[in-house]
């Protein structure tokens, strides 16, 4: 996947590799946490919205051996990277990627689970690199439209999992509740014990339900916390 253009740094996990190509989308801790934290029935059809390099789809394929995963992205370079990563994974027969805007995506079936690391820069200048600007600037996929789209793509018992910074996450959840969603799971994430919550992992359900709440601290005084290691050890090489 080499060319004269900027190449995004790759990343090796225990069972698969991520090559970023020209996507401008490096592997993020947010994405790894979400992929490790989300839950899914088995078997299931899972949709990864805004797949980027395919990280979440690949994590789902590893965790849920009976699931079929469809990934969509609007960026050509992202689709190229995801397609490469899928084809070189052990689960290539259960993974597919489509170059499309999810707002016009019309699949033949509904999904039991959706996973998405949404864009969240609501203000300020767009990122200098155009692909990352598309990946992270809310104008490319507004949250209200994303929620309505997810609601239509899920089956009646379906759920959708997301990760966002705390301010954007609280606004996203508030908006979801006004649209008829229920908050089924919520995990507040702190970078360390002495730092405040900076991320929310959350799951939305179409059916009424109670909220299961939890808490995660990423770093302890001597490295990653035991909880973070337990969550991600199936993926990171050195855990």
Curated annotation (Swiss-Prot):
Superkingdom classification of source: Bacteria
Main localization (coarse): cytoplasm
Keywords annotated in UniProt: Cytoplasm, Methyltransferase, S-adenosyl-L-methionine, Transferase, tRNA processing
Pfam families recorded: MTS (PF05175)
Substrates-to-products reaction catalysed: adenosine(37) in tRNA1(Val) + S-adenosyl-L-methionine = N(6)-methyladenosine(37) in tRNA1(Val) + S-adenosyl-L-homocysteine + H(+)
Protein localization: Cytoplasm
InterPro entries: DNA_methylase_N6_adenine_CS, SAM-dependent_MTases_sf, Small_mtfrase_dom, tRNA_Adenine-N(6)_MTase, tRNA_adenine-N6_MeTrfase
GO molecular function: nucleic acid binding; tRNA (adenine-N6)-methyltransferase activity
Enzyme class: transferase
One GO cellular component term: cytoplasm
Entry's Gene Ontology BP terms: methylation; tRNA processing
EC number of this enzyme: 2.1.1.223
HAMAP family per the UniProt record, alphabetical: tRNA_methyltr_YfiC
Family under the similarity heading: Belongs to the methyltransferase superfamily. tRNA (adenine-N(6)-)-methyltransferase family.
Reported function: Specifically methylates the adenine in position 37 of tRNA(1)(Val) (anticodon cmo5UAC).
Name of the protein: tRNA1(Val) (adenine(37)-N6)-methyltransferase
Organism: Vibrio parahaemolyticus serotype O3:K6 (strain RIMD 2210633)
